A protein has these predicted regions:
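Juxtamembrane intracellular "pre-TM" segments in multi-pass secondary transporters
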Residues: 1-2, 188-220, 410-414, 419
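Helix-to-loop junctions at the C-terminal end of transmembrane segments
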Residues: 59-71, 268-281
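C-terminal ends and interior cores of transmembrane alpha-helices
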Residues: 80-97, 292-305
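Cytoplasmic helix-loop-helix junction between adjacent transmembrane helices
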Residues: 100, 104-148
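Helix-loop-helix hairpin linking two adjacent transmembrane segments in secondary transporters
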Residues: 141-186
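C-terminal membrane-cytosol helix-exit motif in multi-pass small-molecule transporters
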Residues: 173-193, 386-393
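Extracytoplasmic gate region of multi-pass secondary transporters
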Residues: 216-258
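C-terminal transmembrane helical hairpin of 12-TM major facilitator-type secondary transporters
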Residues: 281-328
Length: 419
Protein backbone atom coordinates (compact mmCIF):
# COMPACT_ATOMS: atom_id res chain seq x y z
CA UNK A 1 0.00 0.00 0.00
CA UNK A 2 1.31 3.45 -0.90
CA UNK A 3 2.69 5.06 2.27
CA UNK A 4 1.43 8.53 1.30
CA UNK A 5 -2.13 7.19 1.27
CA UNK A 6 -1.98 5.60 4.71
CA UNK A 7 -3.14 8.79 6.45
CA UNK A 8 -6.01 9.10 3.98
CA UNK A 9 -7.08 5.54 4.68
CA UNK A 10 -6.72 5.87 8.45
CA UNK A 11 -8.85 9.04 8.33
CA UNK A 12 -11.50 7.22 6.30
CA UNK A 13 -11.64 4.44 8.90
CA UNK A 14 -12.99 7.03 11.35
CA UNK A 15 -16.25 7.23 9.36
CA UNK A 16 -17.49 3.62 9.72
CA UNK A 17 -16.17 3.69 13.29
CA UNK A 18 -18.24 6.78 14.11
CA UNK A 19 -21.35 5.47 12.35
CA UNK A 20 -21.09 2.11 14.11
CA UNK A 21 -20.64 3.75 17.50
CA UNK A 22 -23.60 6.01 16.78
CA UNK A 23 -25.86 3.00 16.32
CA UNK A 24 -24.38 -0.02 18.08
CA UNK A 25 -23.45 1.67 21.36
CA UNK A 26 -27.17 2.17 21.99
CA UNK A 27 -27.86 -1.60 21.93
CA UNK A 28 -26.78 -2.34 25.55
CA UNK A 29 -28.63 0.80 26.66
CA UNK A 30 -31.98 -0.14 25.04
CA UNK A 31 -33.42 -1.92 28.12
CA UNK A 32 -32.56 1.15 30.25
CA UNK A 33 -34.15 3.48 27.67
CA UNK A 34 -37.24 1.25 27.64
CA UNK A 35 -37.61 1.55 31.41
CA UNK A 36 -36.90 5.30 31.53
CA UNK A 37 -39.37 6.13 28.75
CA UNK A 38 -41.88 3.43 29.82
CA UNK A 39 -42.25 2.03 26.30
CA UNK A 40 -42.51 -1.50 24.85
CA UNK A 41 -39.62 -3.60 23.53
CA UNK A 42 -40.93 -3.06 19.99
CA UNK A 43 -40.97 0.72 20.48
CA UNK A 44 -37.44 0.78 21.83
CA UNK A 45 -36.26 -1.34 18.89
CA UNK A 46 -37.51 1.44 16.60
CA UNK A 47 -34.71 3.67 17.92
CA UNK A 48 -32.38 1.41 15.92
CA UNK A 49 -34.81 0.75 13.07
CA UNK A 50 -35.82 4.34 12.20
CA UNK A 51 -32.13 5.20 11.77
CA UNK A 52 -31.77 2.39 9.27
CA UNK A 53 -35.03 2.87 7.34
CA UNK A 54 -34.23 6.41 6.25
CA UNK A 55 -30.69 5.33 5.37
CA UNK A 56 -32.08 2.57 3.13
CA UNK A 57 -34.04 5.14 1.12
CA UNK A 58 -31.29 7.75 0.84
CA UNK A 59 -28.13 5.67 0.37
CA UNK A 60 -28.67 5.11 -3.40
CA UNK A 61 -29.22 8.86 -3.86
CA UNK A 62 -26.04 9.60 -1.91
CA UNK A 63 -24.16 7.09 -4.06
CA UNK A 64 -25.39 8.69 -7.27
CA UNK A 65 -24.48 12.18 -5.98
CA UNK A 66 -21.01 10.96 -5.01
CA UNK A 67 -20.50 9.77 -8.59
CA UNK A 68 -21.71 13.15 -9.88
CA UNK A 69 -20.17 15.75 -7.54
CA UNK A 70 -17.46 13.84 -5.68
CA UNK A 71 -17.16 11.59 -2.64
CA UNK A 72 -15.81 14.16 -0.16
CA UNK A 73 -18.51 16.72 -1.03
CA UNK A 74 -21.12 14.17 0.04
CA UNK A 75 -19.31 12.75 3.09
CA UNK A 76 -18.61 15.96 5.04
CA UNK A 77 -22.15 17.47 4.94
CA UNK A 78 -23.49 14.03 5.86
CA UNK A 79 -21.28 13.89 8.95
CA UNK A 80 -22.55 17.35 9.95
CA UNK A 81 -26.19 16.19 9.66
CA UNK A 82 -25.37 13.11 11.75
CA UNK A 83 -23.89 15.32 14.46
CA UNK A 84 -26.99 17.54 14.48
CA UNK A 85 -29.16 14.43 14.88
CA UNK A 86 -27.11 13.44 17.91
CA UNK A 87 -27.64 16.87 19.47
CA UNK A 88 -31.41 16.61 18.92
CA UNK A 89 -31.63 13.18 20.61
CA UNK A 90 -29.46 14.28 23.52
CA UNK A 91 -31.40 17.49 24.08
CA UNK A 92 -34.77 15.67 23.89
CA UNK A 93 -33.71 13.01 26.41
CA UNK A 94 -32.37 15.70 28.76
CA UNK A 95 -35.03 18.41 28.59
CA UNK A 96 -38.36 16.95 27.41
CA UNK A 97 -40.71 15.04 29.72
CA UNK A 98 -41.98 12.68 27.02
CA UNK A 99 -39.04 12.63 24.58
CA UNK A 100 -39.66 9.41 22.61
CA UNK A 101 -40.87 10.99 19.35
CA UNK A 102 -38.23 13.74 19.39
CA UNK A 103 -35.58 11.07 19.99
CA UNK A 104 -36.90 9.26 16.91
CA UNK A 105 -36.68 12.55 14.97
CA UNK A 106 -33.04 12.92 16.00
CA UNK A 107 -32.37 9.33 14.99
CA UNK A 108 -34.04 10.08 11.65
CA UNK A 109 -31.54 12.92 11.09
CA UNK A 110 -28.70 10.59 12.04
CA UNK A 111 -29.97 8.09 9.47
CA UNK A 112 -30.00 10.80 6.79
CA UNK A 113 -26.40 11.66 7.64
CA UNK A 114 -25.25 8.06 7.78
CA UNK A 115 -26.66 7.45 4.30
CA UNK A 116 -24.14 9.84 2.79
CA UNK A 117 -21.14 9.02 4.94
CA UNK A 118 -20.23 5.38 5.59
CA UNK A 119 -21.50 3.85 2.28
CA UNK A 120 -19.54 6.37 0.17
CA UNK A 121 -16.30 5.27 1.86
CA UNK A 122 -16.27 1.95 -0.05
CA UNK A 123 -16.19 3.47 -3.56
CA UNK A 124 -13.70 6.13 -2.38
CA UNK A 125 -11.26 3.41 -1.32
CA UNK A 126 -11.79 1.82 -4.74
CA UNK A 127 -10.95 5.18 -6.35
CA UNK A 128 -7.79 5.69 -4.29
CA UNK A 129 -5.95 2.54 -5.38
CA UNK A 130 -5.36 1.08 -8.83
CA UNK A 131 -4.01 -2.28 -7.64
CA UNK A 132 -6.83 -4.69 -6.71
CA UNK A 133 -4.76 -6.22 -3.92
CA UNK A 134 -4.40 -2.76 -2.33
CA UNK A 135 -8.13 -2.17 -2.78
CA UNK A 136 -8.88 -5.44 -0.96
CA UNK A 137 -6.45 -4.56 1.83
CA UNK A 138 -7.96 -1.07 2.17
CA UNK A 139 -11.49 -2.44 2.24
CA UNK A 140 -10.42 -4.98 4.85
CA UNK A 141 -9.17 -2.12 7.02
CA UNK A 142 -12.46 -0.22 6.55
CA UNK A 143 -14.49 -3.32 7.46
CA UNK A 144 -12.21 -3.93 10.43
CA UNK A 145 -12.82 -0.37 11.63
CA UNK A 146 -16.54 -1.04 11.25
CA UNK A 147 -16.34 -4.25 13.25
CA UNK A 148 -13.94 -2.76 15.81
CA UNK A 149 -16.59 -0.11 16.37
CA UNK A 150 -19.05 -2.91 17.03
CA UNK A 151 -16.63 -4.43 19.57
CA UNK A 152 -16.09 -1.29 21.62
CA UNK A 153 -19.56 0.20 21.12
CA UNK A 154 -21.39 -1.93 23.74
CA UNK A 155 -18.61 -1.18 26.23
CA UNK A 156 -18.59 2.56 25.44
CA UNK A 157 -22.40 2.69 25.53
CA UNK A 158 -22.58 0.86 28.86
CA UNK A 159 -19.86 3.04 30.43
CA UNK A 160 -21.52 6.28 29.30
CA UNK A 161 -25.00 5.13 30.34
CA UNK A 162 -23.67 4.19 33.79
CA UNK A 163 -23.07 7.92 34.34
CA UNK A 164 -26.45 9.03 32.95
CA UNK A 165 -28.69 7.07 30.60
CA UNK A 166 -28.80 9.63 27.77
CA UNK A 167 -25.05 10.42 27.74
CA UNK A 168 -24.42 8.12 24.70
CA UNK A 169 -26.60 10.45 22.60
CA UNK A 170 -24.32 13.42 23.39
CA UNK A 171 -21.14 11.65 22.31
CA UNK A 172 -22.38 11.14 18.74
CA UNK A 173 -21.79 14.80 17.68
CA UNK A 174 -18.36 14.69 19.36
CA UNK A 175 -17.36 11.62 17.36
CA UNK A 176 -18.69 13.25 14.17
CA UNK A 177 -16.64 16.40 14.76
CA UNK A 178 -13.43 14.37 15.06
CA UNK A 179 -14.21 12.51 11.84
CA UNK A 180 -15.04 15.75 9.97
CA UNK A 181 -11.66 17.24 10.92
CA UNK A 182 -9.76 14.10 9.85
CA UNK A 183 -11.55 13.78 6.50
CA UNK A 184 -11.41 17.50 5.67
CA UNK A 185 -7.67 17.90 6.28
CA UNK A 186 -6.16 14.49 5.57
CA UNK A 187 -8.18 12.77 2.83
CA UNK A 188 -6.91 13.61 -0.65
CA UNK A 189 -9.49 12.65 -3.26
CA UNK A 190 -7.95 11.25 -6.49
CA UNK A 191 -8.06 13.60 -9.45
CA UNK A 192 -11.29 13.16 -11.38
CA UNK A 193 -11.25 11.88 -14.95
CA UNK A 194 -11.78 14.42 -17.72
CA UNK A 195 -14.92 12.73 -18.96
CA UNK A 196 -18.19 14.04 -17.58
CA UNK A 197 -20.39 11.85 -15.38
CA UNK A 198 -23.44 10.41 -17.15
CA UNK A 199 -26.73 12.27 -17.23
CA UNK A 200 -29.48 10.78 -15.08
CA UNK A 201 -31.24 9.30 -18.13
CA UNK A 202 -28.02 7.63 -19.27
CA UNK A 203 -27.34 6.49 -15.72
CA UNK A 204 -30.73 4.76 -15.45
CA UNK A 205 -30.22 3.13 -18.85
CA UNK A 206 -26.77 1.80 -17.97
CA UNK A 207 -28.01 0.73 -14.53
CA UNK A 208 -30.71 -1.45 -16.12
CA UNK A 209 -28.12 -2.86 -18.50
CA UNK A 210 -25.87 -3.70 -15.58
CA UNK A 211 -28.52 -5.82 -13.88
CA UNK A 212 -29.40 -7.50 -17.15
CA UNK A 213 -25.87 -8.89 -17.48
CA UNK A 214 -24.84 -9.09 -13.81
CA UNK A 215 -28.07 -9.68 -11.91
CA UNK A 216 -27.11 -13.08 -10.50
CA UNK A 217 -24.01 -12.14 -8.55
CA UNK A 218 -25.21 -8.63 -7.68
CA UNK A 219 -28.50 -9.86 -6.21
CA UNK A 220 -26.63 -12.63 -4.37
CA UNK A 221 -24.19 -10.21 -2.76
CA UNK A 222 -26.96 -7.74 -1.90
CA UNK A 223 -28.99 -10.55 -0.30
CA UNK A 224 -26.09 -12.03 1.66
CA UNK A 225 -25.14 -8.61 3.03
CA UNK A 226 -28.72 -7.96 4.14
CA UNK A 227 -29.11 -11.39 5.74
CA UNK A 228 -25.81 -11.18 7.64
CA UNK A 229 -26.69 -7.79 9.14
CA UNK A 230 -30.24 -8.95 9.94
CA UNK A 231 -28.84 -11.85 11.96
CA UNK A 232 -26.10 -9.78 13.59
CA UNK A 233 -28.32 -6.96 14.84
CA UNK A 234 -31.15 -9.32 15.70
CA UNK A 235 -28.88 -11.47 17.86
CA UNK A 236 -27.31 -8.40 19.49
CA UNK A 237 -30.77 -7.08 20.37
CA UNK A 238 -31.74 -10.52 21.72
CA UNK A 239 -28.54 -10.74 23.79
CA UNK A 240 -28.93 -7.24 25.22
CA UNK A 241 -32.35 -8.15 26.60
CA UNK A 242 -31.63 -11.77 27.56
CA UNK A 243 -28.40 -11.05 29.45
CA UNK A 244 -30.35 -8.70 31.70
CA UNK A 245 -33.60 -10.67 32.10
CA UNK A 246 -32.30 -14.27 32.28
CA UNK A 247 -28.77 -13.91 33.66
CA UNK A 248 -28.93 -10.64 35.61
CA UNK A 249 -25.97 -9.20 33.71
CA UNK A 250 -26.24 -5.40 33.46
CA UNK A 251 -24.24 -2.22 32.93
CA UNK A 252 -20.57 -2.36 31.99
CA UNK A 253 -20.45 -6.12 32.55
CA UNK A 254 -23.14 -6.56 29.91
CA UNK A 255 -21.19 -4.35 27.51
CA UNK A 256 -18.12 -6.54 27.96
CA UNK A 257 -20.12 -9.72 27.35
CA UNK A 258 -21.68 -8.28 24.18
CA UNK A 259 -18.20 -7.37 22.96
CA UNK A 260 -16.99 -11.00 23.01
CA UNK A 261 -18.61 -12.22 19.76
CA UNK A 262 -17.94 -8.83 18.17
CA UNK A 263 -14.24 -9.15 18.97
CA UNK A 264 -14.18 -12.43 17.03
CA UNK A 265 -15.96 -10.67 14.17
CA UNK A 266 -13.36 -7.88 14.13
CA UNK A 267 -10.33 -10.19 14.17
CA UNK A 268 -11.75 -12.46 11.46
CA UNK A 269 -12.62 -9.43 9.32
CA UNK A 270 -9.09 -8.05 9.57
CA UNK A 271 -7.45 -11.37 8.69
CA UNK A 272 -9.82 -12.06 5.79
CA UNK A 273 -9.29 -8.56 4.36
CA UNK A 274 -5.53 -9.08 4.43
CA UNK A 275 -5.57 -12.57 2.91
CA UNK A 276 -8.11 -12.43 0.08
CA UNK A 277 -6.04 -10.17 -2.20
CA UNK A 278 -7.65 -10.15 -5.65
CA UNK A 279 -8.51 -13.84 -5.74
CA UNK A 280 -12.25 -13.90 -6.35
CA UNK A 281 -12.47 -17.68 -5.99
CA UNK A 282 -11.15 -17.34 -2.44
CA UNK A 283 -13.69 -14.56 -1.81
CA UNK A 284 -16.52 -16.82 -2.98
CA UNK A 285 -15.52 -19.77 -0.80
CA UNK A 286 -14.83 -17.65 2.28
CA UNK A 287 -18.27 -16.06 1.86
CA UNK A 288 -19.84 -19.52 1.60
CA UNK A 289 -17.83 -20.98 4.50
CA UNK A 290 -18.43 -17.98 6.77
CA UNK A 291 -22.19 -18.04 6.19
CA UNK A 292 -22.36 -21.81 6.71
CA UNK A 293 -20.28 -21.58 9.91
CA UNK A 294 -22.69 -18.91 11.15
CA UNK A 295 -25.68 -21.14 10.41
CA UNK A 296 -24.25 -24.24 12.12
CA UNK A 297 -23.05 -22.38 15.21
CA UNK A 298 -26.39 -20.61 15.75
CA UNK A 299 -28.34 -23.84 15.30
CA UNK A 300 -26.23 -25.48 18.02
CA UNK A 301 -27.27 -22.71 20.46
CA UNK A 302 -30.69 -24.33 20.94
CA UNK A 303 -29.05 -27.18 22.86
CA UNK A 304 -27.80 -25.08 25.78
CA UNK A 305 -28.93 -22.58 28.40
CA UNK A 306 -25.42 -22.18 29.83
CA UNK A 307 -24.15 -18.62 29.40
CA UNK A 308 -20.50 -19.62 28.83
CA UNK A 309 -21.33 -22.21 26.19
CA UNK A 310 -23.69 -19.74 24.52
CA UNK A 311 -20.97 -17.09 24.38
CA UNK A 312 -18.56 -19.64 22.89
CA UNK A 313 -21.11 -20.36 20.16
CA UNK A 314 -21.59 -16.65 19.50
CA UNK A 315 -17.80 -16.20 19.34
CA UNK A 316 -17.72 -18.77 16.52
CA UNK A 317 -20.66 -16.98 14.89
CA UNK A 318 -18.65 -13.77 14.98
CA UNK A 319 -15.84 -15.50 13.09
CA UNK A 320 -18.33 -16.54 10.41
CA UNK A 321 -19.68 -13.01 9.98
CA UNK A 322 -16.21 -11.44 10.08
CA UNK A 323 -14.97 -13.80 7.37
CA UNK A 324 -17.89 -12.99 5.08
CA UNK A 325 -18.16 -9.19 5.17
CA UNK A 326 -14.74 -8.17 3.71
CA UNK A 327 -15.23 -10.64 0.85
CA UNK A 328 -18.58 -9.10 -0.05
CA UNK A 329 -17.07 -5.60 0.07
CA UNK A 330 -14.18 -6.60 -2.19
CA UNK A 331 -16.30 -8.52 -4.70
CA UNK A 332 -18.70 -5.67 -5.27
CA UNK A 333 -16.16 -2.81 -5.16
CA UNK A 334 -13.54 -4.38 -7.42
CA UNK A 335 -16.20 -5.59 -9.84
CA UNK A 336 -17.57 -2.16 -10.69
CA UNK A 337 -16.16 0.61 -12.87
CA UNK A 338 -15.26 3.87 -11.11
CA UNK A 339 -18.04 5.90 -12.76
CA UNK A 340 -20.79 3.78 -11.23
CA UNK A 341 -19.00 2.44 -8.17
CA UNK A 342 -20.69 4.87 -5.77
CA UNK A 343 -24.20 3.99 -6.91
CA UNK A 344 -23.86 0.20 -6.92
CA UNK A 345 -21.95 -0.02 -3.64
CA UNK A 346 -24.53 2.30 -2.10
CA UNK A 347 -27.30 -0.10 -3.13
CA UNK A 348 -25.31 -2.84 -1.44
CA UNK A 349 -25.04 -0.67 1.69
CA UNK A 350 -28.81 -0.11 1.52
CA UNK A 351 -29.38 -3.85 1.62
CA UNK A 352 -27.14 -4.12 4.67
CA UNK A 353 -29.23 -1.40 6.33
CA UNK A 354 -32.38 -3.37 5.47
CA UNK A 355 -30.96 -6.13 7.64
CA UNK A 356 -30.10 -3.67 10.43
CA UNK A 357 -33.61 -2.19 10.26
CA UNK A 358 -35.50 -5.49 10.29
CA UNK A 359 -33.39 -7.37 12.85
CA UNK A 360 -34.34 -5.70 16.18
CA UNK A 361 -38.15 -5.38 15.68
CA UNK A 362 -38.54 -8.88 14.22
CA UNK A 363 -36.44 -10.45 16.97
CA UNK A 364 -38.41 -8.44 19.56
CA UNK A 365 -41.59 -10.12 18.29
CA UNK A 366 -40.02 -13.60 18.09
CA UNK A 367 -38.63 -13.37 21.63
CA UNK A 368 -42.14 -13.04 23.07
CA UNK A 369 -43.11 -16.53 21.89
CA UNK A 370 -40.06 -18.80 21.91
CA UNK A 371 -36.38 -18.08 22.54
CA UNK A 372 -35.29 -21.15 20.56
CA UNK A 373 -37.11 -19.73 17.54
CA UNK A 374 -34.56 -16.89 17.54
CA UNK A 375 -31.81 -19.39 16.76
CA UNK A 376 -33.88 -21.46 14.31
CA UNK A 377 -34.63 -18.36 12.23
CA UNK A 378 -31.05 -17.07 12.49
CA UNK A 379 -29.62 -20.42 11.39
CA UNK A 380 -32.09 -20.75 8.50
CA UNK A 381 -31.38 -17.21 7.25
CA UNK A 382 -27.62 -17.81 7.42
CA UNK A 383 -27.98 -21.09 5.54
CA UNK A 384 -29.90 -19.29 2.78
CA UNK A 385 -27.01 -16.81 2.56
CA UNK A 386 -24.54 -19.68 2.14
CA UNK A 387 -26.61 -21.18 -0.71
CA UNK A 388 -26.61 -17.79 -2.47
CA UNK A 389 -22.82 -17.72 -2.20
CA UNK A 390 -22.46 -21.31 -3.43
CA UNK A 391 -24.77 -21.15 -6.44
CA UNK A 392 -24.82 -17.49 -7.56
CA UNK A 393 -21.22 -16.32 -7.16
CA UNK A 394 -19.20 -18.10 -9.84
CA UNK A 395 -15.75 -16.64 -10.50
CA UNK A 396 -14.11 -18.09 -13.59
CA UNK A 397 -10.59 -19.43 -13.40
CA UNK A 398 -8.15 -17.08 -15.07
CA UNK A 399 -6.70 -18.43 -18.29
CA UNK A 400 -3.63 -16.43 -19.21
CA UNK A 401 -4.42 -12.72 -19.38
CA UNK A 402 -7.51 -11.20 -17.85
CA UNK A 403 -10.46 -10.53 -20.09
CA UNK A 404 -9.91 -7.19 -21.76
CA UNK A 405 -11.93 -4.38 -20.27
CA UNK A 406 -13.11 -3.13 -23.65
CA UNK A 407 -14.76 -6.51 -24.34
CA UNK A 408 -16.54 -6.37 -21.00
CA UNK A 409 -17.68 -2.83 -21.66
CA UNK A 410 -19.63 -4.01 -24.68
CA UNK A 411 -21.88 -5.82 -22.24
CA UNK A 412 -22.04 -3.43 -19.33
CA UNK A 413 -20.42 -0.33 -17.86
CA UNK A 414 -19.82 -2.35 -14.71
CA UNK A 415 -17.58 -5.34 -14.29
CA UNK A 416 -16.68 -8.16 -11.98
CA UNK A 417 -13.20 -8.68 -13.38
CA UNK A 418 -12.99 -12.46 -13.38
CA UNK A 419 -16.69 -13.26 -13.78
Amino acid sequence: MESKKRLDLISLTSIPLVMTLGNSMLIPVLPSIQKKLEISSFQVSMIITVYSIVAILLIPIAGYLSDRIGRKKVIIPSLIITGIGGLVTGWAAWKINDPYWIILLGRLLQGIGSAGAAPVVLPLVGDMFKNEKEVSSGLGLIETSNTFGKVISPIVGAVLASVIWHLPFWFIPLFCFISIVLVFFLVKVPKADDKKPPLFHDFVKSFKKTFKYNNRWLIAIFSIGGIIMFVLFGILFYLSTTLEEMFGITGIQKGLVLAIPLLALSIASYIAGKKIGQNKAVMKWLTFSGSLLLSISLLSAIFTDEIYFLLGILFISGIGIGTTLPCLDALITEGIEKEARGTITSLYSSMRFVGVALGPPIYAIIMKSDHNMVFYISAAASFIASTFAFFAIKPEKEKGENIKEENLMKKSPYRLSDY
